[in-house]
Structure formats: structure tokens, C-alpha cells
Amino acid sequence: MKERDVNDAQETPPPLEGKVSAGVLAVVVYAAAFASDRWIPNSLLSLPLLIATLIAAIVTWWGVPKLRGLKLGQVIREEGPQAHLTKSGTPTMGGLLVVPVGVIVGGLISWSGQAAEQLLAVAFITLAYMVVGGIDDWRSLTKHTNTGLTPRGKLLLQALAAVIFLIWAGMRGWISGDVALPFDINLPLNWLIWPLAVFVFLAESNATNLTDGLDGLAAGCGALVFTGMALQLTLRGNSGDPSLAGFCMAMAGCWIGFLVHNRNPAKVFMGDTGSLAMGGALTAVALLTNSLWPLLIMGGIFLAESLSVIIQVWVFKATKGADGIGRRVFRMSPLHHHFELGGTPEQLVVPGFWLATVFLVLIGIFFKPN
């Protein structure tokens, strides 16, 4: 029996190394950008992608020891997967290093006109969400717990930043009251677009936050979704979109550069500082370019992660008995932990979710609005 167990262990393939899967992801993103610049008129995606990647990788390499010196080590929740306890103390708040890189590189694409002001507005909301995430991370670190701001406090700050952005966009007439769908279909929402926009800001940023639970997971998915958003904007060719497409590629580049240090085994985590900024930037671009539909499809992993938490909590509360115990749909939520506890190693869950995002991006491009 022992000999058989040894043979079985020898036949089990080792988990995919983080640097290999991260390298493949980077090749996919760069190939898409180069192909767009080669064959699509007015496409300029490769340059901001390359510049942001290089700067982000260097800044993160420089910044990780600084974060470690400040003792900004992640506190791992004890009720999570036990294998994650070994990650305790890994520097967090890495978003502080790379989000400004993406914002600055993306913001330098256009210097005048409406495009420049839109880039400024997107930069504002991205940095505002980074600050909210930073406050949350800092409170968590100073309290030595896995929780920072209260959920209500965090949502209020996010909503306030979103409302300021929407007032700015509304005064300039940048946001359409119709939601563009495939096949020349437009969903007329009129004034309802405004409460929907606030909801999407809150939902998307918290969904990207929930996705940031495994080494490289959120960074890789974010890089792919930003790339997909840029490609569909370039293909649609609407006025003003090329600048925002370039901004998306700068953000994709900053996350690829971050992934050099965040892939398994991670030397740094993005924290809420990075994940909230990621969701805020994606939502802002989607609203300004009437791309809520593509974002919904391409960000399907973010949606699935968020829904898994909602379903888990709802079912548990609905079935809770007198003993205080309820049923669970998933082994643990968010969704990536369900697969982990099912025996799939982290090094396979992450590239699996990346691959799913690639397919979702392709679907979003194929069924893009006109």
C-alpha cells in the first residue's frame, strides 16, 4: 500500500509555477495589444502598456522592502484556509505603488479637449478609491485584524467619491441615459442611469476586492479585463474612446508589472488600496464609454466571486436553526476558496480563473455594442 501511495504521488503533476502562468498571461496581453496596433486604425495600446509595465515592476521592486520596513504585513483571518496562515506578514498596500503609475501613464495620453478632462475625471475616481482602500488597509494593520473600516463607513466613502465623479460627468454630459447592448439594442434608463451608476461603482469595486484572495488572482484578472475593455473600445472607434482605451492599457500594464512580484509565491499584496482602485477605474471607463455591458461580461469572475458571497450568506441565514448553524452552498466563499478547499492547489485555481477571464473577454468583444 505504501509503495502504491508513493507511485501515485510521483504521478501527480506538480502545480504550475506562478512565474510560468504569469508569463503566459503577459504574452497574451502584449500579443493582443500589438495585434490591435498593427491591424486596427488609430489603435495605440502597446506604448502605454509597455511603459506602465516597466515602471510598475521597478517601483514595486523598490517599494516592497519599504513596505516591509514599515511593518505593513497582511493579517490573515484565522477562519480562512489554513494554508494561507503562512502568508501572514507579507507586505500589503501594494496598490499604493502601482495604481499611481497606471493613472499617470494613462493620464498623459491626451493633453487637451474633452478626452483630457475625461482622463482627469477617471484619474480622480481611481485615486479616490485607492485612498479609501488605503484607509481601510491602514486601520486593519494598526488594529492587527483583518477588518479595517466598518462596511457602512467604507460604502459611504465609496458612494461619496462616486457621486462627485457622476456630478462632474453629468455636468459635462458625458454619460448616456441609454445602456448600449449588442445587436444595436439600447436600453433606455433615462434618470435611472444615475442610481445604477452608483450601484455599479460599489458593486464592481467590492467584487474586485473579494477577488483579491489568492496570489496574483485579482491582478491577472484585472489586467485581462482592462485589456478587453481597451480592445472593444478600439474596435468600436467612438469619439474620445482611443484615449480611454490607452488609459485601460496603462492600468493593465501596471497590474502586469505588479504581477512580477505578486504571482505565487507573492512577495506583496495589493490590499484594498489596489483592489478598490481597480474596480473604480473599470466602472468609470465603462460609464463614460457606454460599456457597462462589456464590463459585465468580461468581469464575470468578479461577478461570480461577489455572488458566491451573497448566496453563501443568504442561504446560511435562511436555513439557520436554533443551534445557530445553517447550510452552506460553497465549502467557503468567495468562490476561489471553494476550489481550494476542494483540493485544487492555489497554483491551479489562479490560472484557471485567468483562463476563464480570457474566454469572457473574447465573448465580451464578440458581443460588444456598436
Swiss-Prot record:
For this entry, the protein name equals Phospho-N-acetylmuramoyl-pentapeptide-transferase
Q: In which pathway does it act?
A: Cell wall biogenesis; peptidoglycan biosynthesis
Pfam families on file? Glycos_transf_4, MraY_sig1
Q: Which UniProt keywords apply?
A: Cell cycle, Cell division, Cell inner membrane, Cell membrane, Cell shape, Cell wall biogenesis/degradation, Magnesium, Membrane, Metal-binding, Peptidoglycan synthesis, Transferase, Transmembrane, Transmembrane helix
* Chief location bin: membrane
CDD domains in UniProt? GT_MraY
What role does this protein play? Catalyzes the initial step of the lipid cycle reactions in the biosynthesis of the cell wall peptidoglycan: transfers peptidoglycan precursor phospho-MurNAc-pentapeptide from UDP-MurNAc-pentapeptide onto the lipid carrier undecaprenyl phosphate, yielding undecaprenyl-pyrophosphoryl-MurNAc-pentapeptide, known as lipid I.
Localisation per UniProt entry: Cell inner membrane
